[in-house]
Amino acid sequence: MSEHRIAMVGTPCEIMAASKLQHYTDSPIDVKLGLFCMENFSYKYFEHLLKEYDLKMDDIEKFQIDKGFVFLLLKTREIVKIPLSVAKRIIRKNCNICVELTSETSDISIGSIGSDDGWSTLIIRTEKGEEIVNGALEQKFIEAKELTDSRFNLLNKLAENKINKNLEEMKN
């Protein structure tokens, strides 16, 4: 066993690969923090898209997808709104066959779906994840409140939609 232990943050496909790695090698990965992910953009093509808006990666402070748009909060505090229909062309092709939204093989899943502004939704998936979250709460590094049933149902609905859409894509 490696003496160096690390925590890994990744999308569902990256977390799934890390989970498999833990079973077959002397993996240093001790904790897996999985992000919610509908799809991911190719970095190279995202840079090209930004050029169309006279922007660079370094200009962006925050990135958010909401209500059919990609919102870019720039360091200048300006907001750039790109229609998701335009951004769809730079989605990584392998995302069209991924059926995972919430990083189910992680210790803790994290995302904005179901969250109020300034908050993140956490799903604790393992004992290790529970220890980490409880420790962070005790140390007052984070605050927590329960996710309402309606917001939890929204998360489940979006996860189901992703599964159904991408299973259909795999048939074609």
Question: What is the predicted function of each stretch?
Answer:
Residues 8-18, 39:
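Gly/Ser/Thr-rich loops at beta-strand to alpha-helix junctions
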Residues 13, 37, 95-98:
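Disulfide-bonded cysteines in secreted/extracellular proteins and peptides
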Residues 3-7:
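Short active-site oxyanion
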Residues 17-20, 133-134:
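Short glycine-/acidic-enriched loop or helix-start segments at secondary-structure transitions
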Residues 23-35:
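A short alpha->loop->secondary-structure connector
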Residues 54-172:
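Long, compositionally biased charged/polar accessory segments in the mid-to-C-terminal portions
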Residues 22-26, 49-51, 137-142:
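Short, solvent-exposed amphipathic alpha-helical segments in soluble enzyme
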Residues 39-49:
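Short, charged, surface-exposed secondary-structure boundary motifs
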